[in-house]
């Protein structure tokens, strides 16, 4: 005679909370498992999946068209000519930090079209 799943569920429903706790402890001991392990691993993965919201646009090289890159840096940052030139020559350097993804992509496109090498971090 084998016991069906429905019969097992009915037996659980008839038990008190203390009896269920004792049964779970006995099952953990018999099969060498722990009910708490599944809860811990699920919470750890949820914390890992977090999307980045702020980005840094980094100029890695000014390329051949240095004048166009300096103009692009000036328009994006509001720096003067001397500061923008110094920034382009100091590559790798962060042109803008803590900007949104859309703004970072637009700045990267502008600098790349001017001939610069750019990374978004």
Curated annotation (Swiss-Prot):
| Name of the featured protein | Large ribosomal subunit protein bL12
Provide the gene name from the record: rplL
Q: Which organism is it from?
A: Shewanella baltica (strain OS223)
GO molecular function ontology, one term from the record: mRNA binding
Task: Report the InterPro entries cross-referenced here.
Answer: Ribosomal_bL12, Ribosomal_bL12_C, Ribosomal_bL12_C/ClpS-like, Ribosomal_bL12_oligo, Ribosomal_bL12_oligo_N_sf
Q: What does this protein do?
A: Forms part of the ribosomal stalk which helps the ribosome interact with GTP-bound translation factors. Is thus essential for accurate translation.
Pfam families found in the cross-reference section: Ribosomal_L12 (PF00542), Ribosomal_L12_N (PF16320)
One Gene Ontology cellular component: cytosolic large ribosomal subunit
Query: CDD domains per the record?
Result: Ribosomal_L7_L12
